[in-house]
Amino acid sequence: MDRSRRTQEDPDLGMLSGRTLFGLQRELFAALAEQGHPGLRPRHGAVLAYLDDDGSRATDLAARSGRHKQVIGTLVDELVELGYVERRRDPADRRAKLIVPTERGRDFIVRSDAILAELEAAHARAVGEQAYAEFKRVFRLVAARQAALTSDAGT
């Protein structure tokens, strides 16, 4: 069997993960654009998906998202310009800055969470609630194992 046929019939974990991620992102960001958030792109999720309500440090966002701190800094600059976050002094450490969602940012996060919950519910209905719950349980294990392997390798 040639490679292109094999990747269609029996895609590996990376291909399946990528297809799932990109498909979810297309659906999510199209819905968000219709709901008043047309300027955001999937890359902004590295900040907004991991941002605490009361703010997060850029170093924490980098660790949670797996992105380099410089990438997070660039994304935060874009999100500040778009009006989704602001930088504030961290009351716990006046030298540090917190990235805090604005009202627009909080609206985006609430809408995003609701859309993703509906997408997940639709998948659960399609494959069965129990099968979907088991899929998520196993996928979390695989993701955690992969993260541990990556961190053990020093990357």
Go through each PLM region and give its residues.
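Charged, amphipathic alpha-helical coiled-coil/dimerization segments
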Residues: 77-140
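Alpha-helical macromolecular-interaction surfaces
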Residues: 19, 23, 73-74, 130, ...
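C-terminal regulatory/oligomerization modules of transcriptional regulators
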Residues: 1-8, 130-155
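Alpha-helical linker/hinge and terminal dimerization helices associated
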Residues: 17-20, 24, 28-31, 65, ...
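Positions in alpha-helical segments
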Residues: 11, 15, 46, 121-122
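N-terminal helix-turn-helix DNA-binding core of bacterial DNA-binding proteins
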Residues: 26-71, 154-155
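N-terminal leader segment of winged-helix/HTH proteins
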Residues: 1-39
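Generic structural concept
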Residues: 18-21, 48, 52, 102, ...
